[in-house]
Amino acid sequence: SESSAKKFERQHMDSRGSPSTNPNYCNEMMKSRNMTQGRCKPVNTFVHEPLADVQAVCFQKNVLCKNGQTNCYQSNSNMHITDCRVTSNSDYPNCSYRTSQEEKSIVVACEGNPYVPVHFDASVAASA
């Protein structure tokens, strides 16, 4: 079965670079990465950075996770990300998403040995 680390990669990593101006990016990616099976996953973020750079976040700034756990980490630098949000007129199985590109700091939960990201917690605008 899929490990938590592999699930994180499937759901959140797209290192091929930014999707530029493809408005269908989220529709295509959410489907190809199996996040529209059984339901339309409401929100998902893809990170367009090398996997090693995202894994390195586990050794950066320790922050509190949204659920109160203490194993979350915030990236020291901004990363290119794409936020996918299901549209209000979206009707399963025809999941439809709005694609928005951002440059933000990311927050991930890490666990295991090796210590790697297993959950995408948030993206935050970097403080100036």
Swiss-Prot record:
User: What are the protein's GO molecular function terms?
Assistant: lyase activity; nucleic acid binding; ribonuclease A activity
Q: Which InterPro entries match?
A: RNaseA, RNaseA-like_dom_sf, RNaseA_AS, RNaseA_domain
Extract the Pfam families matched here.
Answer: RnaseA
Primary residence? secreted
Catalyses: an [RNA] containing cytidine + H2O = an [RNA]-3'-cytidine-3'-phosphate + a 5'-hydroxy-ribonucleotide-3'-[RNA]; an [RNA] containing uridine + H2O = an [RNA]-3'-uridine-3'-phosphate + a 5'-hydroxy-ribonucleotide-3'-[RNA]
**At which positions is substrate bound?**
K7, R10, K41, P42, V43, N44, T45, K66, R85
Regarding protein family, the annotation reads:
Belongs to the pancreatic ribonuclease family.
Subunit structure comment from the entry? Monomer. Interacts with and forms tight 1:1 complexes with RNH1. Dimerization of two such complexes may occur. Interaction with RNH1 inhibits this protein.
For this entry, the protein name equals Ribonuclease pancreatic
Q: Which organism is it from?
A: Myocastor coypus
Phylogenetic classification of the source organism: Eukaryota, Metazoa, Chordata, Craniata, Vertebrata
